[in-house]
A protein has these predicted regions:
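Extracellular interaction modules
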Residues: 115, 185-187, 329-334
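Extended, compositionally biased non-globular segments
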Residues: 224, 229, 233-378
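Short loop/beta submotifs within extracellular cysteine-rich repeat domains
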Residues: 130, 198-203, 342-350
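Short linear interaction motifs
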Residues: 100-104, 167-179, 311-324
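Extracellular-facing segments of soluble proteins and assemblies that are Gly/Ser/Thr-biased and enriched
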Residues: 132-224, 230-233
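Solvent-exposed N-terminal domain segments of exported/luminal and surface proteins
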Residues: 2-171
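Residues within well-ordered beta-strands of beta-sheet-rich folds
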Residues: 121, 191-193, 337
Length: 378
């Protein structure tokens, strides 16, 4: 087994604000505030959660905004107020009608980003969990290298609130994300559930050779690193979690509906169990409604229970990832990968999961908060 110098990886990966860069819309410093390896508990990170993102308004982004299903009511003038070629700082308005985030940078969502001083300590000798008991929780599961919180794939809601069919945040919150594919929760903590093109640009992944292995995008609470989408050799890392075909005898249910759930979606040979009619999921031909009143097609892939792990896929090795959405190769040791398709659309489980590979002694180790500054409109 390759010995990994986690202290060296931490030292090289965090984006530290050494020039006191300030976001004028938050009146707060951006990215990591301080970072030090000399903590008795591990790698010590202090940050405020406000990234130094900037978005170049391209024609593609303008069309994306214009074609939002509720553009006529979401934007103050019925359309985005943007200029092609302009660089928009994180928080600078694009015309959204938002009662809470006054700048108009964010579509309607759970909350407005706040700047908060926060402190985390990551273990420098991560331990593999031999019994894989650490399920990915709601809320933070780690930290991206620019101080943005890393969240798992769930959105805290279930179909009809019956605690059976768990909704996936990247599906049901797809219209609640900003141009950097992030948003804030009700407490004001800005976070990503999946790949962020803005973080990729910040890490200068666009300029990396096609054959290069991705850089570290963040650190998971179990102490293992999360790398970007590329495995190397011009190839993406590939998730082996696959969507159920409800009409198939192998992965579906006898009636072709969401009437059964795998006993263990990590091992489909263990079969399924039928759910009572009250707990059946929607037909894959139905439409559902998000919290922001957008229509979400109920096709397979919008609930956690729509997925199963294909061990034969993972057994191929190389670019194919294990149950935890990670692998070990060359001199990297075990690491997770962000998963996307060729168009950089997020692919389940997006970051990690559904269980941590390593031992998590706390879901949010050594965390301290003090309110600094709420988003302000200048």
């Amino acid at each position: 087994m390759v010995a990994i110098n986690y202290a060296a990886l931490h030292a090289a990966s965090w984006l530290i604000n050494r020039i006191n860069q300030v976001n004028v819309y938050f009146h707060a410093a951006t990215d990591i505030i301080t970072s030090a390896a000399n903590s008795k508990n591990g790698w010590d990170v202090k940050f405020n959660g406000i990234p130094s993102y900037a978005v170049n308004m391209t024609d593609d982004l303008i069309r994306q905004l214009q074609h939002r299903p509720k553009a006529s009511t979401e934007f103050i003038n019925g359309a985005p107020n943007v200029t092609e070629g302009k660089l928009y700082e994180f928080g600078e308005g694009v015309g959204y009608r938002s009662s809470r985030c006054r700048s108009g940078f964010w579509p309607p969502g759970p909350g407005c980003p706040h700047s908060k001083t926060r402190h985390l300590v990551f273990p420098l000798a991560p331990e593999v969990d031999p019994i894989q008991r650490g399920s990915v929780p709601l809320g933070p599961i780690g930290l991206f290298v620019n101080g943005v919180a890393m969240y798992g794939f769930k959105d805290a809601f279930t179909y009809r609130n019956l605690a059976t069919w768990e909704r996936l945040a990247p599906e049901f919150e797809r219209f609640d994300m900003d141009l950097c594919e992030g948003h804030a929760d009700a407490s004001g903590r800005y976070h990503h559930h999946h790949f962020s093109p803005c973080l990729s640009r910040q890490l200068e992944e666009d300029s990396s050779p096609d054959s290069a292995h991705a850089k570290i995008y963040g650190w998971v609470n179990d102490g293992f690193p999360l790398y970007g989408p590329h495995h190397g050799n011009k190839s993406l890392a590939i998730s082996c979690w696959q969507k159920r075909d409800y009409s198939s005898s192998l992965t579906g249910c006898s009636d072709g509906q969401r009437s059964c759930i795998f006993n263990n979606n990590g091992d489909i040979s263990l079969g399924t169990y039928s759910v009572p009619s009250l707990l059946m999921g929607p037909s894959t031909n139905d439409n559902l409604t998000s919290l922001s009143s957008n229509i979400i097609p109920a096709e397979s892939g919008v609930f956690y229970q729509d997925f199963y792990f294909n061990s034969s896929c993972a057994d191929q090795g190389g670019v194919y990832l294990n149950y935890h959405n990670g692998h070990s190769h060359d001199d990297f040791g075990f690491h997770y990968h962000i998963t996307v398709d060729k168009e950089l659309h997020p692919v389940f489980p997006y970051l990690i999961g559904p269980k941590f590979y390593g031992v998590v002694k706390s879901s949010d180790p050594v965390s301290m908060y003090s309110h600094q500054s709420r988003f302000q409109s200048l």
